[in-house]
């Protein structure tokens, strides 16, 4: 864990050989049952799961744990303007086991915040611009006991964490497929860095072969 009291961030994703996490229609079904069980096992080891609002709007996930015993964790949604529906699974499904935090900006109207709070959702505000300030947000999450987070996308949120150099570890499952398409969703999107020298560096720790699937585990490199 870092000394500056930020949660340990693990980016977890499954992608195709050509780096896509979803097809051009948004179909994200890449992981097989074995990988899903491994992902759910990994979820039991963290204090929170984080996704962006687009993941909620497109997939409406429950962000819960199957296959393994557990004590629950926080579901954390980055949603600058509080736009996800109040009947989303991430809000309505088993909130007593998986309490939900939504991270918005400081400009979010109090009236809108109250709509979510009456549905047992805690709102944390960070940043005065159009986007949530992740650098300021993470210490706030640490202070309430969230010391490790599994980041599960989507691509825009992945970029925000990469841009701000907040990723500590990466776990990638690579499926033996090529989906193609300029409109298919890549692992990391956003504006990207202008020069390769700006790219974030990671050190390969482990390679796991399973049938034609490969799991790659990386940790941040400070070199």
Which residues fall in each region the model found?
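Enzymes that bind and transform nitrogen-containing heteroaromatic metabolites
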Residues: 1-223
């Amino acid at each position: 864990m870092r000394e500056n009291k930020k949660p340990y961030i693990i980016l977890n994703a499954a992608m195709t050989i050509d780096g896509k996490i979803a097809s051009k229609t948004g179909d994200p079904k890449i992981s097989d049952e074995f990988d899903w069980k491994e992902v759910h096992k990994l979820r039991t080891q963290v204090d929170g799961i984080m996704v962006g609002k687009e993941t909620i709007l497109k997939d409406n996930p429950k962000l819960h744990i199957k296959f393994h015993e557990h004590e629950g964790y926080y579901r954390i949604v980055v949603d600058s303007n509080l736009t996800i529906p109040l009947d989303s699974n991430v809000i309505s499904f088993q909130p007593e086991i998986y309490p939900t935090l939504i991270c918005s900006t400081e400009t979010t109207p109090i009236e809108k915040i109250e709509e979510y709070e009456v549905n047992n959702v805690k709102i944390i505000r960070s940043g005065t611009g159009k986007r949530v300030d992740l650098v300021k947000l993470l210490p706030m999450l640490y202070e309430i006991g969230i010391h490790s987070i599994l980041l599960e996308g989507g691509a825009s949120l992945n970029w925000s964490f990469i841009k701000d150099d907040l990723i500590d570890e990466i776990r990638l499952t690579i499926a033996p497929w090529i989906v193609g398409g300029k409109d298919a969703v890549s692992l990391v999107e956003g504006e990207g860095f202008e020069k390769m020298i700006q790219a974030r560096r990671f050190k390969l720790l482990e390679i796991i072969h399973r049938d034609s699937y490969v799991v790659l585990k990386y940790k941040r490199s400070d070199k």
